[in-house]
Swiss-Prot record:
Short name of one Pfam family: Ribosomal_L33
Name of this protein: Large ribosomal subunit protein bL33B
Family, per entry: Belongs to the bacterial ribosomal protein bL33 family.
GO molecular function, one term: structural constituent of ribosome
GO biological process: translation
Residue stretches in coiled coil: none
Keyword Ribosomal protein: yes
GO cellular component: cytoplasm; ribonucleoprotein complex; ribosome
Lineage of the species this protein comes from: Bacteria, Pseudomonadati, Myxococcota, Polyangia, Polyangiales
Keywords: Ribonucleoprotein, Ribosomal protein
Keyword Transport appears in the UniProt entry: no
NCBIfam families from the UniProt entry: PRK00504.1, PRK00595.1, rpmG_bact
């Protein structure tokens, strides 16, 4: 089953993107370089959990 995750900027801490991830095949934390509109440059974005409520 694919879970929805948010991608949080490593520098400013804002959640700018969201995507899905298959936890069976990718067991580590997801890290990718993406553009942060707050800082106006490419930074590392790390996986965070979206609360279901």
């Amino acid at each position: 089953m694919r879970d929805i995750i948010k991608l949080t900027c490593g520098n400013c801490g804002r959640a700018n993107y969201h995507t899905t991830k298959n936890k069976r095949t990718m067991t580590d934390k997801f890290v990718i370089k993406k553009f942060c509109p707050t800082e106006r440059k490419h930074t590392e974005h790390k996986e965070g959990k979206i609360s279901k409520g």
